[in-house]
């Protein structure tokens, strides 16, 4: 039997994903700010998305952000403004390209030097966002696993 300590979903999801984004920096991490700390509204809002910190499955996310959207947020401490990640349609379906997101789940048992990859989730999309709600009218989309060489 496994000695497992489980962190209930979705409470951990909020802290680990969106809440930590403003604290992370790197070449492959989209620049992110808490909305209440925003000093000036960027002129190039087409390159940003507006996300509520405490949402799930893309609910409340504004893809095509306007200045009025930002000014209309009543609780800016609960929102982030994040650089938009443009997914390229790299998988070829019979009729056109499909965008892909691959999520990796690692487990880190006590005493292990590093985490171990446990499973992955590959999500295919043709919509503005990745997820069922944004792709229900498209084909060759959905979730699966990805195979890789060991």
Put a short name on every predicted segment.
Residues 1-150:
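Domain-scale recognition of functional cores that engage charged ligands
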């Amino acid at each position: 039997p496994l000695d497992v300590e489980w962190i209930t979903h979705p409470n951990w999801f909020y802290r680990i994903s969106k809440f930590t984004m403003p604290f992370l920096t790197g070449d492959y991490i989209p620049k992110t700010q808490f909305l209440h700390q925003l000093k000036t509204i960027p002129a190039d809002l087409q390159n940003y998305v507006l996300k509520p910190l405490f949402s799930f499955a893309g609910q409340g996310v504004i893809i095509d952000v306007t200045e009025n959207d930002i000014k209309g947020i009543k609780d800016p401490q609960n929102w982030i403004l994040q650089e938009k990640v443009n997914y390229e349609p790299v998988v070829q379906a019979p009729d056109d390209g499909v965008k892909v997101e691959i999520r990796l789940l690692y487990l880190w048992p006590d005493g292990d030097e590093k985490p171990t990859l446990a499973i992955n989730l590959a999500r295919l999309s043709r919509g503005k966002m990745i997820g069922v709600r944004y792709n229900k009218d498209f084909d060759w989309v959905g979730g699966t696993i990805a195979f890789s060489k060991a």
